[in-house]
């Protein structure tokens, strides 16, 4: 059997002589009608999107999370269903079908696959699911692409009758492409939702020669207060732990107060995060 990219349409692979019917039955798994992947393979957000597009006969437009995946957006769970934009009565397990009207400037082509532009993708993601989820998804899309929120606002003005515009406008006010993980987004939303000033993201701290010593997840440069979300490896990896200790000493030597946030704090004791950030801001001279 020759090398075979996947997902693929079974009838096309057979017609091209890339495999035999026996190989197709025994070595591959059908994920949608006539669409196959190797039995040992696991679908990612990208390959799940491509599989859905192949199921449509290459006629649908990737939308929502599937479009975001092809725009290289991170933090999309692999198990989430693919999303296509195509007026159709057909249904397939694991595929969400939308029937939105898309203007010509709201779609683009990537590797031969038609999908919604970053702006249109953001327009759709920001209107769906809850506020926090929508902000997380927009943060990730902004971080991965050249998305400009002004372009999303233009689409909101164009499609004034679309559902979810109230949430979309709230999401646009809260989104920030500087977030590098969903937990960073959640931390920022917690701080803003508690009445603290909106923090900057990815603050660079430099020495007297302009060399970057540290990049702080978020904070308030005017008052030298930083907030950092530490993933599990910051606590379990000895080398990372040593680097963090040295880095914190460097920042404190330059007058910074750092509030460290863990998953447990964020999930179970968010009030502690807010209290520590508020205390640090007051100590730094912020007029709260």
Regions found by a protein language model. Give the residues of each.
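Short gly/ser-rich loop at a beta-strand->alpha-helix junction or flexible surface loop bordering the NTP-binding
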Residues: 1-166, 183, 282-288
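Surface segments flanking catalytic/ligand-binding clefts of nucleic-acid enzymes
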Residues: 7, 12, 58, 142-288
